[in-house]
Amino acid sequence: TLNGAFNEMANFNGMAALETPEFMLSKMDEFGSPESYNHYAVGWAWAMDTPYQWTKQVASHWGGTRNGTIVHWPTGIQEQGGLRTQFCHVIDVAPTILEAAGLPEPIQVNGVTQSPMEGASMLYSFNQADEPERHEVQYFEMFGNRGIYYKGWSAVTKHRTPWQMVGQKMVAFGDDIWELYDGSKDWSQAHDLSKEMPDLLHKLQRQFLIEATQYNALPLDDRQVERLLPQTAGRPTLIQGDSQQFFPGMGRLSESSVVSIKNKSFSVTAEVEMGSQPANGVIIAQGGKFGGWSVYAKDGKLKFTYNVLGIHEFPT
């Protein structure tokens, strides 16, 4: 968000305007505490990604994906405090742990046949700093921001700006402008070589399509909040109808596992066994301190509270 947020859910619910500068100042001492669900302002987020371009969600550029990693294994790594430059990806972590433990890749987990792991173990680099890297190709994609790493080179395109969640004019994927960087000389992606080396750029663009096809990243989808709803995202709607029954002992249910009551009136009916003492406790709740509602008993009286994003509560 441009100005940051005390409660990120306000932005997701189209109510960022409720967090006025005066409100933010009044909460200053609570930022970073359990009372906040805060979100960095764009300027600070970008500054913390220096010297890379862009921020999270912009998976095309290193500012949206690249992070330092510390591996601690006193009995397995001979050198102390060494650095490694081989390209690695988060999908390499599990293969690395399995190889280090001398375990095979699991074929089944809890009776479910597993897809083959797509990463490459990093173990070879732990005691061989100059060993050629083994993870040579990797695609990236998020909300249409996409790119590919290929043997030190990266071809990337920023499709949408993450903090413009409403009203952003989207260009066609085919009209996105691609950039080309030589990671062996320009690790911060500062010097675009796309105009000097168009043939290599086209080769890497084609390689992106090959990788994205192989690993089910197509078709590209640049929607954001629309993905939260199964109906608009294209996922199966697990709950049909306009009512749902719950029973004692049921644990936490995800939002897509319960009937949607967004932007509509609703009623709750509960059968409760009362003891001899005044009842206290939650009967049913959805959400929490950062937004939601709850039906509960307090001192033997039935209560209902609607919490607007932690900014205001409407109790009855």
List each model region and its residues.
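Short, solvent-exposed loop/turn and secondary-structure capping segments
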Residues: 2-12, 80-81, 99, 109, ...
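Active-site regions of oxyanion-processing enzymes, predominantly non-cytosolic
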Residues: 1-8, 62, 125-126, 137, ...
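C-terminal cap/loop subdomain of S1 sulfatases and analogous C-terminal strand-loop tails that border
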Residues: 34-62, 77-86, 91-183
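Long, internal low-complexity/basic segments
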Residues: 93, 145, 155, 161, ...
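Histidine-centered active-site microenvironments of extracellular/periplasmic hydrolases
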Residues: 1-73, 79, 161, 165-168, ...
